[in-house]
Structure formats: structure tokens, C-alpha cells
Amino acid sequence: MASAPSCQRLAIGQPTHVGLIANMQAQKVQLPGGRWHFQHGPMDIIIGAEGDTLVLKDAHAQAWERFKGILQELVLELPVLRRPVQDTCPLHGPIAQRMWLACQPYQNSLQGGFITPMAAVAGSVAQELLQFYQAEGVHRAWINNGGDIAIHLATDASVRVGWYSNLERFNGEQLQNGISLDGQWEIRSDSPVRGVATSGWRGRSFSLGIADSVTVLANTAAQADAAATVIANAVNINDARIVRRPACEVKDDSDLGTTLVTVDVPPLPSELIQRAVSRGLACALTLRAKGLISSAALVCQNLCMTTDAVLQPILDNSLTVAACGTEYA
């Protein structure tokens, strides 16, 4: 998810907007299947959990109380969250510190670039809420923050993570009749994976690269979020046909400032795509060797690559992908 500054994961707002943010009302709606939808400003979260009814009721209540204060908590530290990660963590809140810790491994390895804690904000928020479901009586739970997912699994539990590869074909009819996924894989309780995240130029975040998507499995959602950002940035090539603009011109409160971000990628020759995705794969393999990720799937136009066989069945069925994300099946 060239030198690789962070992607901005949520447009939280300028410090001068604290009063406005404080007056915004967090909202929650119960969904079919016992799921919950929490929304507050840019945060849009789906929570699913299975287990003892009373335990789940208490977990949902605690998660909601915590959720209501998260946005203002992050806004108060936003000026520091938008600075490049340095040797010593200057942050105070638990989510902000988690963001910094997830990004810290990349501070000296981005070929002259930089990374800010904002690269891990969505996964870190999901992880913060997951703590209320890591309790006796909860069989499994997942917090999906815009496609960045934190997972809890009790002993012998598992969850299937589905892959929807082409956002261009998505329409309202699929919501009524069921979404046809391009593939799925299972995460079991004996696996260390508890986080899934996706980054790419087509998503809601900024990216320096040309990947339609990079989906990462890691030990935590925060780690997956940061790594997906870094790997997606590494899927890159210099070509005049790629449209890039300063991040501050696309969104004036971006933590990336004048860094050029990708806004359009036309169809490119296969040899250029091969070179770009190979660069991203090399980055992903390096991160896996360092223990920062478990697996990664990289997609750019008609080319898919993966770090290992865990994700290969998905990629075999998705060779004409335009964009992808993560979703529970």
C-alpha cells in the first residue's frame, strides 16, 4: 500500500473542527442477523458476533459507549497523527498509540519516503472495539470498518472471509439477491491471523501506487491496515498516462501534503503491469519474512499475484478484476 508515505484512511478533519465534530451525533442501527451498524462522521462500522445472548448484549453496549467518543479522541491528537512516524511515540490515546505502533516498523524502510500513523487508523479503530468481544461466551466476532476487519475467534471457531473483486459491477440488486463473491478463504482459531485490510488507488484512501487492490492478512487489523497501505504504494510504475495529483489538491486536510497520489490509471501494457505488481509482491514477501504479515493478494488490471498458496484459489477465479475489497460471507 517509489517511496511510500501513508495513505489517509479517514478524513477526520482539521483541529479547528473539534467543536463541530463534538456536536455530531453517533448513530447505531441493528441489522438482520443480530449485526450492528455504528456510524459517526467518517467512521462506518459493521459488527457481527455470535455467542451467549447476554454476553453479546453487554459487549454491544460497551462497544457502543466506546465508539461514541472515538472520533473526538482522534481529532484532539490529529496534528500529531498527521506527522511522520519517528523513533519515540508522542501520542497518548490507546487508538492513536496503536496506529503509531503499527506504522513504526516502516519508518526507516520506505526508500526516503515517510509514513504517518493515519495509515493504520481504520484497522486500529476496529481493533479497539474488538476488545469488548474478546470475552468468555463470545464464539466469534468481527468488526468491519470500511473493509478493514478485526476478528475474534474462540477455540475451534473459524470465519470465512469473502473476496468481491469488481466494484464496477456492484449494484443495488445484489444487495437484495445476495452478493456473488469471487472467492473466499477460511481463518481458523489456530491461525495467528486476526486482521484483514485492503488498500489501493480505487478505494476511499489515497495511494501512491496503481494497484486496484492489495488485500493483507496479518496478526491484527492495525498491522494489516498499515501493511496494505505500504504494499499498495509499492505496486507502482512511472508512466505519463497515469494521472497523479498532489494529495492536498484532492483533499485539503490530507496528511500527505503535496505528495502525488494516483487518481486515474488507464489500461497499460501487460509488461508494465507485470513490473509494477512484481515490485509490490517483492515488498509483500519482505514484510512476510519480517513477520509483519501472513499473506497478501495483489491485483492490478488483469494481473493477480499472491505471497503464497493460501489465497491462490481466490486469484485463480479473479483474473479480470477491476477492484476488490474484503467482506464477510
Residue ranges and their predicted role:
Residues 2-25, 53-144, 148-149, 219-307, ...:
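Alpha/propeptide regions of enzymes that mature by internal proteolysis
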Residues 115-218, 223-224:
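Glycine-rich anion/phosphate-binding loop at the beta-strand->alpha-helix junction
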Residues 40-53:
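Generic N-terminal amphipathic, Lys/Arg-enriched alpha-helix
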Residues 34-35, 203, 284:
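Generic recognition of flexible, low-complexity loop/linker segments
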Residues 39-41, 209, 289-292:
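A structural signal for short secondary-structure junctions
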Residues 33-35, 44, 140, 158:
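A generic structural signal for beta-strand entry/edge sites
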Residues 26-39:
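Acidic, low-complexity proline/glycine-rich segments
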